[in-house]
A protein has these predicted regions:
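A glycine- and charged-residue-rich anion-binding loop/surface
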Residues: 1-284
Length: 284
């Protein structure tokens, strides 16, 4: 997957603050306030497609360290936003780019979890379910979708069970760039209605290899799994997610529902709390 190298070398191409480019970090107009660094390449994920940005650092060993608190795309460029901890960063400096794995890991879990949840919603509620929005944060995932009625407890249980079956089976997650025209032929492919996608487009599939799909585009087998257009970060195997627990279901607009869920350590904590509460009720 893209962005998977935890550390990589890059060169500073620009220093940016308050709509101005400067030659080095000593020349930023507003000292003490965050500014941006543009690199020739990066392993950090900029906020996009509902997934929150990576954090991390840009380091010149022993000479300078820049703490990255946010990564955003601005006019097609990836801007690393943050604060200089010490030293000076100049245009053409070589830096080590390090993302924070402790933040990236739950983001990966929650993003692949969102794909699994999307598939489960369609399977249990019907093909009319379309994604209306999403949030992938380290602590939770949120998914908005088209559906006219509240999702009842039995349906939520089925969706959660189907999601956890994917996780327990510990199947591979695949990603590959394909031409938009070819990718749109894959049966069961999920995309956000009205969204403009690049060409080529990145296809992320669970269990079946995207390269295998590309050789047999119309095979109905592909309907039996999650296949989506996506440029985000994902786990390599579904077992890494640990568990998915739905914590909330609500209506946010006419014909639009919202589900909030947690994965990994957060899911274990929520389950433990629920079990303790159930035990206390039993004891009353």
């Amino acid at each position: 997957f893209k962005y998977d190298t935890p550390s990589m070398q890059a060169h500073v191409k620009a220093v940016f603050q308050d709509h101005k480019f400067v030659s080095d970090s000593d020349s930023v107009p507003k000292v003490g306030e965050p500014f941006g660094i543009l690199l020739d390449q990066t392993n950090m994920y900029a906020e996009s497609g509902g997934q929150q940005a990576d954090t991390g650092s840009l380091v010149i060993d022993g000479k300078a360290e820049f703490e990255v608190t946010d990564v955003q795309v601005s006019n097609g460029y990836v801007l690393h936003i943050g604060f200089l901890k010490y030293g000076t960063l100049r245009v053409d400096d070589q830096v080590m780019v390090n993302y924070d794995e402790a933040r990236r890991r739950p983001l990966r879990n929650n993003h692949t979890g969102t794909h699994i949840l999307n598939f489960g919603l369609r399977e249990i509620l019907g093909d009319h379910v379309d994604q209306k929005g999403s949030l992938v944060a380290p602590t939770k995932l949120r998914f908005d979708f088209s559906h006219k009625a509240p999702v009842n407890v039995a349906e939520l249980a089925k969706i959660e069970d189907m999601s956890n079956d994917f996780i327990k089976r510990d199947v591979n997650v695949y990603g590959k760039d394909m031409s938009l025209e070819e990718a749109q032929k894959i049966p069961g492919l999920r995309a956000v209605f009205g969204e403009s996608y690049p060409n080529p487009v990145r296809v992320v599939a669970i269990e079946f290899d995207v390269e295998e799909m590309a050789k047999d585009l119309t095979n109905p087998r592909w309907r039996s799994t999650s296949v989506e257009f996506c440029g985000g970060t994902h786990v390599r195997r579904t077992g890494e997610i640990g568990r998915l627990v739905i914590t909330e279901e609500s209506g946010i607009a006419k014909g639009t529902r919202r589900i909030v869920a947690v994965t990994g350590d957060e899911a274990s904590e929520v389950s433990r709390t629920a079990e303790e509460a159930a035990q206390r009720l039993e004891d009353i």
